[in-house]
Amino acid sequence: MELRPVWFDSLGAKSMCVLVRTPDLALLIDPGAAIMQPRYPAPDALKAYYLNLATRAIRNAAADATHIAITHYHYDHFRPDIPELFAGKTMWIKDPNRWINRSQWGRARAFLSSLVESVGGKYRERSSAMAEYPDPLDALPLAAQSDRRADLIAKWRKRFVGLTKLWGEGSWVDAAGFAGRIAFADARTFTIGDTTVRFTAPMFHGIESVSYTHL
């Protein structure tokens, strides 16, 4: 197996894009890059310069990839503005329907609806599936017992209840519409030849960020 960092930089354009090669596939993970936040002490022109370099490197890597994985919908991990990156690829992506925050819920839908021309298939939505969503903070008893964070925890639980309503009542994106070119990868394993790619269940980022990803 060969692992090649495509673009790792936080000096002007943040990214964490990796190309993994095996005899069976070439998997591009998180093909995204974004300009550093305004408070980062670098001129805008320098940030744009690094973003252009990152975009060029990601385009070149995507040309060699057979598969693409997107762990979550932050712009330094995917580039919805360059749909041609995804043309002809099999995509394993973060489930856009659950264990996802509101901003990424919307980003995922805009992204997937824009991919029909480059990836194929049809963008479809369906009724949500009934499910129970345990509060991930319940698995972190030490964090939950911190008196100094009591107010923050209370705010988190209120937001979490709102998210479970979104997941349970909002329309879900139907992966079947993409005819096998796009799969929601949370907690799934894929086998291509002698290569096995395993994705974890969504990882909780903490009560401050209310975000989820997987590896």
Residue ranges and their predicted role:
Residues M1-L53, K155-H205:
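Zn-dependent metallo-beta-lactamase
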Residues D24-I70, H77-E84, K89, K94-R109, ...:
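Pre-active-site segment of Zn-dependent metallo-hydrolases
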Residues T213-H214:
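Conserved small/polar residues in nucleotide/adenosyl-binding loops
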